[in-house]
A protein has these predicted regions:
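Acidic, Ser/Pro/Thr-rich low-complexity regulatory regions
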Residues: 1-106
């Protein structure tokens, strides 16, 4: 059940990313977390890698309450850094998301 739930969530997040409802970083953090709950094939492990790499590259950026407490100027600076990092991964993230919307649900 956990494997199936994680796979369905990955599919939903990948779809939301392709529809631009999430940033690459937000999708990467969520997919990287969920990928640890999936019994993955070799091919799926390769698809998850780019999401894990982007999540690690942006892990220092505060989220949720920690983000809310930042000064406006700090948020702007971190957003610029995030978009610069995302640009390096974007092509691979988009291609990975395209693959993950078809992830096997069994």
């Amino acid at each position: 059940v956990k494997n199936l739930d994680a796979r369905q969530s990955i599919q939903i997040i990948a779809r939301a990313l392709l529809q631009k409802d999430l940033t690459d970083t937000e999708a990467a953090m969520r997919i990287a977390f969920l990928s640890r709950q999936v019994t993955a094939t070799e091919a799926e492990l390769k698809q998850f890698t780019v999401f894990q790499q982007l999540a690690e590259a942006t892990a220092y950026i505060p989220i949720l309450d920690d983000w809310a407490m930042l000064e406006k100027s700090e948020k702007k600076r971190l957003n610029r850094e995030r978009t610069t990092i995302e640009a390096k991964y974007s092509e691979f993230i988009q291609a990975g998301a395209q693959q993950l919307i078809n992830i096997k649900l069994s």
